[in-house]
């Protein structure tokens, strides 16, 4: 710290007259003393000059450092601005690139859709064309066979008549055998279908009954658990409230006892004071009694401090009681809200499962009806074909040719039936995937599957292997 300037201006003015005496009138001692003071003042001025020079150098150094730091910060700021501009340019370039990629993806998606639609149309047209070609070929073959049959009838009437009798007998036998076999097969498969339908109906009713029982049991158990939890919480807070009330009452009783003790001590102190005034003569006895009273007074002060602490504890207990009541109300509201959310989520899940099961059952019913209609059509075509063969009296070669063509037609129909069975399996797989998705959602929301109340029924198709992949990945029919 710089030394203080003491009387600098006064000293400057006192060079002419020092202590009321001119320099020429001073003695040697006065002059020496004056010179010593001037030297001290000169040394002090030199110290101040050196101090101010150091301060000036420090300030100049600080200014240089600050100026360099300012230039560095400006350079950093310019670099940051340049980096921000470059980053913005790169960002704009990336945005353009991503927009271009999105355009390309949209274009490819549209092209793929158009190709898929075109392929589907072409496949459908080819299938229709193939069916028309097969139908024309069959009609043409029938006409050719009729022409050949007429030619053979004209050329070999006698042989044909004899053969017709034999063939009629054999055809009658074969027809009777075929009709008997058809009736047996129909009766057999009707019986199997009826048994299978009855078994499936019984299984479905049993599973529905079990699901309803489990659901009702779980709902009652869950409601009982919630009621028990609510009763426990209510009893817990009631116990806390009763304990706090008991504590408050006990503290109030203690405070009342302290107040009574304080009044009693004050009365005793007043009595002692009166006795002290009356009994001034026996001084030693009065001193002893005074010491005893001082001890009692100290006890009284301690009792007052205990009373203050008790009041503070009473206030803290009242605040805790108020906080616990508020927490109890908040927990009751949260419990009611959580119960309402659980009931709403359970209702939505049950509605969604019921809707999905209805849709899936309807689709399965439609596919089964289509399959039954195709089977009936195939059986009808077989009967018609047998009747045509019986009426046409074809030779074995022509019969073999017609049978082969009929087998091709039947194979195409069987392929259609397999496709329908595959479609039915795919729908069942989609239904099962939807059930697993709902189960995953329930687990994600923190709802255990056991608390749902029922187990959704997964569907299966006889002859199909339902994998664990997406709905489109269904195993081939076995």
Curated annotation (Swiss-Prot):
Induction description: Expressed during serum starvation or contact inhibition of cells grown in murine fibroblasts.
Keyword Coiled coil: yes
Coiled-coil blocks: 24-207, 242-426
Assigned keywords, A-Z: Cell projection, Cilium, Coiled coil, Cytoplasm, Cytoskeleton, Flagellum, Golgi apparatus, Microtubule
Basic residues composition-biased segments: 1-12
Documented effect of changing residue 391 to V: Moderate decrease in cilia motility
Highest taxon in the source lineage: Eukaryota
Intracellular or extracellular location(s): Cytoplasm; Cytoplasm, Cytoskeleton; Cell projection, Cilium, Flagellum; Cytoplasm, Cytoskeleton, Cilium axoneme
GO BP, sorted A to Z: axoneme assembly; brain development; determination of left/right symmetry; epithelial cilium movement involved in extracellular fluid movement; establishment of localization in cell; flagellated sperm motility; positive regulation of protein localization to cilium; positive regulation of smoothened signaling pathway
A Pfam cross-reference name: GAS
PANTHER family named among the record's database cross-references: DYNEIN REGULATORY COMPLEX SUBUNIT 4 (PTHR31543:SF0)
Quaternary structure, from the entry: Component of the nexin-dynein regulatory complex (N-DRC). Interacts with microtubules. Interacts with SMO. Interacts (via coiled-coil domains) with RAB3B (in GTP-bound form). Interacts with DRC1. Interacts with DRC7.
Family of the protein in this entry: Belongs to the DRC4 family.
Functional summary from the UniProt entry: Component of the nexin-dynein regulatory complex (N-DRC), a key regulator of ciliary/flagellar motility which maintains the alignment and integrity of the distal axoneme and regulates microtubule sliding in motile axonemes. Plays an important role in the assembly of the N-DRC linker. Plays dual roles at both the primary (or non-motile) cilia to regulate hedgehog signaling and in motile cilia to coordinate cilia movement. Required for proper motile cilia functioning.
Record-given protein name: Dynein regulatory complex subunit 4
Organism: Mus musculus (Mouse)
